[in-house]
Design a protein with these regions (language model features):
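Active-site phosphate/ATP/adenylate-binding loop shared across adenylate-forming ligases
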Residues: 1-29, 34-51, 55-259
C-alpha cells in the first residue's frame, strides 16, 4: 500500500463521520444556510426585486421566489455578461460556466467565489465516503483520469468563462496533480476526436485506477481503448476500480460501460 492510500484511510474516516453527524441536523442547517444566503443577497437586484428584506423563513422565501427555468433568469444573466455587478449575487461571479448548447442554446451559469469550493469538496467527499464505507483506498496511489472540457477560459464581461468541468480542472487539489491524467495541454484541445486520441496515447500503459467524467465521454474513451488494443478495457487497466460520473442520467449507459 502506498503513502497516499495510507493517509487516505484516516482522512476518509474523519470526513465520513462528519457527514453522518451533519445528517442529524440537515433540516436546521438548510434553514441556517437559507438565512445566510438571503441576508447576503438582499442588496442585489434579484434580492430587491424579490423582497429579500422581508423573507424570514422557507415559506416566505418560496412565496417570494417562485421556481423558474433558465429563461426566468436570463435578463439577470445578460446583465452579468455585460459586467454589471450585484445582480444575482454580490459583485461579479468568479466564473461563468457555459453549457454545450445542445438543448435550447448555450446557457451561462454564474459561479461565485463562495460556491466554487463546494464543487470540489462535493466530489472529494463522495470519493472519501466510498473509501470509508468500502475500506478500499488502494486506488488512491494510481493514475486518475478526469475527462473534462477544456480548462482554457475566455472572458465574457470581464469574467472567466468556460465549461464547468474545465473550470473545476483549475481547482483540483495539489495532492492529486501527480496522479491526474490527461495532461493540461491535452485537456486544452478543443476538437474532441483529436483530444480523445491524445488521451488514449497518454493513458495506455499507465496504472489507471479511477476514471471520472460524464457517461458518454467515458463510453467513447473505452470504445477507443478497445479499438486501439483489440482487448477488453480491463485487460489494459487491470487495476481500474472506481468510476465517478455526474451531470446526466447514468442508466442508459450502464449496459455498455459494464461490458
Amino acid at each position: 500500500m502506498n503513502i497516499k492510500s495510507l493517509l487516505a484511510k484516516p482522512f476518509a474516516s474523519v470526513v465520513h463521520r462528519q457527514i453522518k453527524k451533519e445528517q442529524l441536523t440537515a433540516v436546521a442547517d438548510q434553514q441556517s444556510i437559507l438565512n445566510q444566503l438571503v441576508k447576503a443577497a438582499k442588496g442585489t437586484q434579484f434580492g430587491k426585486n424579490h423582497h429579500f428584506d422581508q423573507i424570514t423563513d422557507y415559506t416566505s422565501f418560496k412565496k417570494a421566489v417562485p421556481i423558474r427555468d433558465y429563461e426566468g433568469f436570463k435578463e439577470y444573466i445578460e446583465q452579468i455578461k455585460k459586467g454589471t455587478q450585484n445582480v444575482l449575487w454580490k459583485g461579479l461571479p468568479l466564473y461563468l460556466a457555459k453549457t454545450s448548447g445542445t438543448t435550447s442554446g448555450i446557457k451561462y451559469i454564474p459561479i461565485s467565489k463562495e460556491s466554487i469550493s463546494n464543487h470540489i469538496s462535493g466530489a472529494r467527499n463522495a470519493i472519501l465516503t466510498y473509501m470509508s464505507g468500502s475500506g478500499n483506498t488502494d486506488f488512491a496511489g494510481g493514475k486518475m483520469i478526469f475527462l473534462s472540457g477544456s480548462p482554457e477560459l475566455e472572458r465574457v464581461g470581464g469574467i472567466p468563462t468556460g465549461r464547468l468541468s474545465g473550470i473545476v480542472n483549475h481547482h483540483i487539489p495539489q495532492y492529486l496533480r501527480g496522479n491526474q491524467l490527461p495532461s493540461f495541454e491535452t485537456n486544452c484541445i478543443e476538437e474532441w476526436e483529436t483530444k480523445l486520441d491524445k488521451i488514449v496515447d497518454e493513458t495506455l500503459g499507465k496504472d489507471l485506477t479511477l476514471i471520472g467524467g460524464i457517461p458518454p465521454w467515458m463510453q467513447m474513451y473505452f470504445d477507443r481503448i478497445v479499438e486501439r488494443t483489440g482487448k477488453p478495457v480491463i485487460a489494459s487497466f487491470p487495476n481500474l476500480q472506481v468510476l465517478v460520473q455526474g451531470d446526466i442520467n447514468f442508466e442508459p449507459y450502464t449496459a455498455k460501460l459494464w461490458e
